[in-house]
Amino acid sequence: MGFLGTGTWILVLVLPIQAFPKPGGSQDKSLHNRELSAERPLNEQIAEAEEDKIKKTYPPENKPGQSNYSFVDNLNLLKAITEKEKIEKERQSIRSSPLDNKLNVEDVDSTKNRKLIDDYDSTKSGLDHKFQDDPDGLHQLDGTPLTAEDIVHKIAARIYEENDRAVFDKIVSKLLNLGLITESQAHTLEDEVAEVLQKLISKEANNYEEDPNKPTSWTENQAGKIPEKVTPMAAIQDGLAKGENDETVSNTLTLTNGLERRTKTYSEDNFEELQYFPNFYALLKSIDSEKEAKEKETLITIMKTLIDFVKMMVKYGTISPEEGVSYLENLDEMIALQTKNKLEKNATDNISKLFPAPSEKSHEETDSTKEEAAKMEKEYGSLKDSTKDDNSNPGGKTDEPKGKTEAYLEAIRKNIEWLKKHDKKGNKEDYDLSKMRDFINKQADAYVEKGILDKEEAEAIKRIYSSL
């Protein structure tokens, strides 16, 4: 009885204690109620949803021990957090770059990958769209890159077809920007292209000699550049004014003229500019003898050299366009008259219809045609020697008669003297002969480096002006 009474009292004391909640328990319940009533952050809700989803997808393995269950739960929680961060980053990237999103959508769109209708056209070569990142066509048909020699020929052909040296500059600048070639390689490429271009023009000149009726690409391009009815000196002045501001046109003309001189296509029909020099043009028309063909080539070569010289002086501001026109007018009159007096006897008879006959005939005019032609051929083949002989005999006293080259040198000297006297602005420094010589020497050396002139040709031009 004593033991039972003691146990009853213990039960009475314990049960009331378990029936009433602890102070901490009431605090947990109120906190739980407060958490239910308050709105939790969206990120926490998303994390819990992802965690529940992962738990359903990957149920934890039934292994004994509470520690195993806690490890799996932690692993799943880490996966859920990682997935959540990944989704959040993707959403931020989509908001920050809508354009990238558009591009991604287009990549997914299968219709964007379809070929154009032109790709299925059998009449198209397909080269226009085959290498869209290669507009210069530096690939073969099978897609393999061209060799260095093929590229040189391709560039030269493009320059020849378009008659524009700017084509080479564009291609080289692109290769330099891409880092495919160096500066030294660019200079080497320029020399090689100039050599191939010279061969192309020589080949075209030979074809033209075989079939004169077949128009060359150069004459076709030049046909539409000069109007039929233009005042001669007005057209020259307009050309000088344009050449002063257009460097591309000047470079193209210089390149073309230099290559033409080297290939010796000296027909006056290929030099439309000469028709604006009436005296000189009439002189050329009067020379139609086959024996005088060499002399005719010499006249055209030197006249073109002088025209280019005037263009360069105007372009670089040495003289104004108006002064250049006056210079060319004086050049046309003086050089034609002096050359007429140097022609052989049979040529003088033909020219007498266009020019008044001189009162006295020099010793050169009485020479035979055969002897004069032989001397002219010798003088033309050695332009350097003729200039040296002229310098060594300033008085003009020589046992042999002067040739046409020396006559032109004399005309150049008189034109320079005339140019110095007709200084409208009174600034004689612009016409200083030493400055002119330096300018011509620099230009000739620059053209040699660019492949526009041969070294021998440049030396001959420099000797012409150094003898002034």
From Swiss-Prot:
Ranges for region Disordered: 23-69, 353-406
Gene Ontology annotations for the cellular component aspect, listed alphabetically: endoplasmic reticulum lumen; extracellular region; secretory granule lumen; secretory granule membrane; transport vesicle membrane
Pfam families: SGIII (PF15467)
Coiled-coil segments: none
Tissue specificity comment: Detected in urine (at protein level). Expressed in brain, heart, kidney, liver and skeletal muscle.
Species whose genome carries this gene: Homo sapiens (Human)
Membrane topology: Peripheral membrane protein
Modified residues (Phosphoserine): 37, 362
Subcellular locations according to the entry: Cytoplasmic vesicle, Secretory vesicle; Cytoplasmic vesicle, Secretory vesicle membrane; Secreted
Listed InterPro entries: SCG3
Entry function: Member of the granin protein family that regulates the biogenesis of secretory granules. Acts as a sorting receptor for intragranular proteins including chromogranin A/CHGA. May also play a role in angiogenesis. Promotes endothelial proliferation, migration and tube formation through MEK/ERK signaling pathway.
Carbohydrate-modified residues: 37, 216, 231, 359
Domain of life: Eukaryota
Compositional bias of kind Basic and acidic residues: 29-42, 360-406
Signal peptide: 1-19
One of the GO biological process terms: protein localization to secretory granule
Main location: cytoplasm
One Gene Ontology molecular-function label: RNA binding
Keyword annotations of the record: Cleavage on pair of basic residues, Cytoplasmic vesicle, Glycoprotein, Membrane, Phosphoprotein, Proteoglycan, Secreted, Signal
Name of the protein described by the UniProt record: Secretogranin-3
PANTHER family, per the entry: SECRETOGRANIN III, SECRETOGRANIN-3
